[in-house]
């Protein structure tokens, strides 16, 4: 290839910019920035398309922090009320619900810490930054749900085996009704819905793919916590109504705790699957490998695509890397630009890395160039 080979690594807007060259600047004087072939006056930078993704990420984090702070305050107030009410009533179900709220509060703090970490700049050791801290925090929150639910199921079984306890139905009913109201408020605060639209620049665009932005991982984990508590609160209210009208049916307290604990565990399955997909660097839900490949092949001059990888740093920070082969080596710059702009226009990628290669350099026997299995 003519000239020295150069590679550029440019960080996000909030981080420092680095330029790594194979040869030192002493041997090669600084060159003017690359310009568009058709219009020498216009400049094309490889990260021009990342601004929307960066701005969306900043809005997402600010929005998530605000929701988590409000939810934490409300959660703390109702935890205090439930602990006092459950102690007075002698109800395991009420104390169980308070324990769930306490775990929720802890998960909110974990989520806030992970959001703070994920906003830190990248380093030479962590070149992607701390984005995965958000995923790890969400995973920790899900694990705490399983642990606490397991403890509560054990306590419910103990009460079924040894029914030597009394319950104040009136206090239990009042407390459980307040708890249900608290969880409904928390669910409304943490609920998020999104659509695959971009409103940047006053435009209203639709992505060509079926991808829809997923909920922030921290908010999603917190929401799952609250949904679990909502199920638990419903179970407490049901058992409270039974005990209030039929005090001799106090077994309803541990039975409802046991039954609704199963529903709590079921609510974590989907979010746990998505978190593990991110950690395993799997293709994010809603983005199809074949669609991305076809959009690259549709660019004039691209003859083949291999080493195509799709993964995500967080739920909504999707990354693409690929090698493309062309028989028009003289237009490598134009092909690189067209492919990059095409995939950014059709898919919500946070970062795209494309390597252009001459088609005669391809090796059919190369194991790294094989098409992935279904």
Swiss-Prot record:
Pfam families in the record: Cation_efflux
Keywords: Antiport, Cell membrane, Cytoplasmic vesicle, Ion transport, Membrane, Metal-binding, Transmembrane, Transmembrane helix, Transport, Zinc, Zinc transport
Annotated Zn(2+) 1 binding sites: 100, 104, 225, 229
Reaction(s) the record says it catalyses: Zn(2+)(in) + 2 H(+)(out) = Zn(2+)(out) + 2 H(+)(in)
GO BP of this protein: zinc ion import into organelle
Side of membrane Cytoplasmic, spans: 1-67, 113-134, 191-222, 273-374
SUPFAM superfamilies (UniProt xref): Cation efflux protein cytoplasmic domain-like, Cation efflux protein transmembrane domain-like
Keyword flag Metal-binding: yes
Lumenal, vesicle side: 89-91, 156-169, 244-251
Presence of keyword Transmembrane helix: yes
Residue pairs linked by disulfide bridges in the UniProt entry: none
UniProt-annotated binding residues for Zn(2+) 3: 45, 47, 366, 369
Additional remarks: Each subunit of the homodimer independently transports zinc ions in a pH-dependent manner. The cytosolic pH promotes binding of zinc ions to the transporter binding site. Upon change into the organelle-facing conformation, the two histidines of the zinc-binding site get protonated at lumenal lower pH, triggering zinc release into the organelle. The transporter then moves back to the cytosolic-facing conformation where the two histidines get deprotonated at higher pH, resulting in a net antiport of 2 protons.
Role this protein plays: Proton-coupled zinc ion antiporter mediating the entry of zinc into the lumen of pancreatic beta cell secretory granules, thereby regulating insulin secretion.
Name under which the protein is recorded: Proton-coupled zinc antiporter SLC30A8
Gene source species: Xenopus tropicalis (Western clawed frog)
């Amino acid at each position: 290839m003519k000239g020295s080979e150069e590679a550029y690594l440019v960080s996000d807007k909030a981080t420092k910019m680095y330029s790594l060259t194979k040869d030192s600047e002493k041997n090669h004087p600084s060159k003017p920035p690359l310009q568009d072939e058709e219009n020498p006056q216009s400049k094309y930078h490889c990260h021009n398309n990342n601004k929307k993704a960066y701005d969306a990420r900043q809005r997402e984090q600010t929005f998530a922090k605000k929701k988590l702070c409000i939810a934490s305050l409300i959660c703390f107030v109702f935890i205090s009320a439930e602990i006092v009410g459950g102690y007075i009533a002698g109800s395991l179900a009420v104390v169980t619900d308070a324990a769930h709220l306490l775990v929720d509060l802890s998960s909110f703090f974990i989520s806030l810490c992970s959001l703070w970490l994920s906003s830190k700049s990248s380093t030479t050791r962590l070149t992607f930054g701390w984005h995965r801290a958000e995923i790890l925090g969400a995973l920790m929150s899900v694990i705490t749900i399983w642990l606490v639910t397991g403890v509560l199921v054990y306590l419910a079984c103990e009460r079924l085996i040894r029914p030597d306890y009394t319950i104040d139905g009136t206090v239990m009913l009042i407390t459980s009704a307040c708890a249900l109201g608290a969880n409904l408020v928390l669910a409304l605060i943490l609920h998020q819905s999104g659509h695959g639209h971009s409103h940047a620049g006053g435009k209203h665009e639709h992505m060509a793919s079926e991808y829809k932005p997923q909920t922030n991982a921290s908010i999603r984990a917190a929401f799952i916590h609250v949904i679990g508590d909502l199920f638990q609160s419903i179970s407490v209210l049901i058992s409270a109504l039974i005990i209030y009208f039929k005090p001799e049916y106090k077994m309803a307290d541990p039975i409802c705790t046991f039954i609704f604990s199963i529903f709590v565990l079921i609510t974590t399955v989907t979010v746990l699957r998505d978190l593990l997909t991110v950690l395993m660097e799997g293709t994010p839900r809603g983005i199809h490998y074949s669609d991305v490949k076809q959009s690259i092949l549709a660019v004039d001059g691209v003859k083949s695509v291999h080493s195509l990888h799709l993964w995500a740093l967080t739920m909504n920070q999707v990354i693409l890397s690929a090698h493309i082969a062309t028989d028009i080596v003289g237009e490598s710059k134009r092909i690189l630009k067209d492919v990059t702009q095409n995939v950014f226009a059709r898919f919500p990628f946070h970062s795209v890395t494309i390597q252009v290669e001459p088609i005669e350099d391809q090796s059919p026997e190369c194991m790294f160039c094989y098409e992935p299995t279904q």
